[in-house]
């Protein structure tokens, strides 16, 4: 009998930039594409950080919604977890994306 597991992926993280890791997915489409690859390989939970166009960390609810919609479309059943972390951002900004009702948040 096998033991069920949850494999979590955090495709972007809060700190790295493309200059640190050229393959880092920072745009919405890159994040969706790389998350889909992980889903196809067996991942079942995606921990999401979003970025502004200049690659700085963001709490923009619209960016979170776009990534969430793409994951739901291309990775059916995958658990979507939004990051509410936000170095230097106020609490309201850090939780603004929760309006989009992810499966989880941390």
Where are these regions (language model features)?
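Glycine-rich, proline-tolerant flexible connector loops at the mouths of alpha/beta enzymes
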Residues: 19, 44-67
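A structural motif
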Residues: 40-43, 77, 102
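Active-site beta-loop-alpha junctions enriched in small/polar residues
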Residues: 10-14, 51-53, 83-87
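Alpha-helix-loop-beta-strand connector modules within alpha/beta enzyme cores
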Residues: 3, 9, 56-82
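Glycine-rich anion/phosphate-binding loops
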Residues: 23-32, 62
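Extended substrate/RNA-proximal surfaces in nucleic-acid metabolism proteins
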Residues: 88-106
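N-terminal small/glycine-rich loop or linker at the start of catalytic domains
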Residues: 1-23
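Conserved, mostly hydrophobic/aromatic
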Residues: 31, 38, 49, 105
């Amino acid at each position: 009998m096998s033991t069920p597991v949850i494999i979590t992926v955090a495709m972007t993280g809060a700190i790295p930039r493309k200059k640190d890791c050229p393959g880092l997915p920072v745009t919405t489409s890159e994040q969706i594409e790389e998350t889909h690859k992980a889903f196809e390989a067996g991942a079942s939970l995606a921990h999401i950080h979003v970025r502004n166009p200049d690659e700085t960390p963001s709490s923009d609810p619209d960016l979170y919604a776009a990534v969430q919609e793409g994951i739901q479309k291309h990775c059916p059943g995958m658990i979507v977890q939004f990051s509410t972390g936000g170095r230097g951002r106020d609490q309201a900004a850090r939780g603004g994306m929760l309006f989009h009702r992810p499966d989880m948040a941390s």
